[in-house]
């Protein structure tokens, strides 16, 4: 009986079966490898201007929140970050701002509307003291363009942690 009602209402499945997603776990002293992908896996980040938009957005969000960005890799349909928020509760705020601001800019640039980014960002955290894991994550992020056989024009990859100490965005290092 109930299934017939849902079939007639064009809902994919009954509402009673929807399970809420688990809240994101963000811990103090952790770094996060974050991936954000374009909606429908479309290749929307191939333009050179995308790099400037990302760098400007990062500079802008750094005035609001304190974090360390160790790596950034812009692929043609997704972006990788290696980031350490100094206040764990700031990570969702940082990512919300970055995704909102870049989506707004890219939609204007590409003369399109609607969602620019696919579902919420993927994050994988590890203790900042785990240097081996950090190096493996950096290798993965910077090896991504090569593994995808991308030209240097289409991919942009950088590490901001090549100095002796990590860059704190509050110090105005960008």
Segments the model singles out, each with a brief description of its role:
Residues 1-174:
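Short catalytic/metal-binding and nucleic-acid-binding patches
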């Amino acid at each position: 009986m109930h299934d017939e009602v849902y079939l007639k209402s064009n809902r994919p499945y009954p509402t009673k079966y929807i399970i809420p997603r688990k809240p994101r776990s963000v811990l103090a002293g952790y770094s996060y490898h974050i991936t954000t992908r374009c909606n429908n896996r479309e290749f929307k980040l191939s333009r050179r201007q995308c790099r400037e938009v990302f760098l400007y957005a990062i500079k802008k969000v750094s005035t609001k929140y304190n974090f360390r960005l160790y790596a950034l890799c812009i692929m043609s349909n997704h972006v990788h970050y290696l980031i350490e928020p100094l206040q764990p509760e700031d990570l969702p705020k940082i990512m919300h701002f970055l995704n909102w601001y870049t989506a707004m800019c890219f939609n204007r640039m590409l003369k399109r509307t609607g969602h620019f980014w696919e579902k919420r960002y993927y994050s994988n955290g590890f203790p900042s003291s785990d240097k081996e894991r950090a190096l493996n994550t950096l290798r993965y992020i910077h090896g991504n363009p090569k593994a995808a056989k991308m030209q240097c024009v289409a991919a942009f990859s950088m590490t901001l942690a090549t100095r002796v100490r990590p860059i704190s965005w509050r110090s105005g290092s960008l």
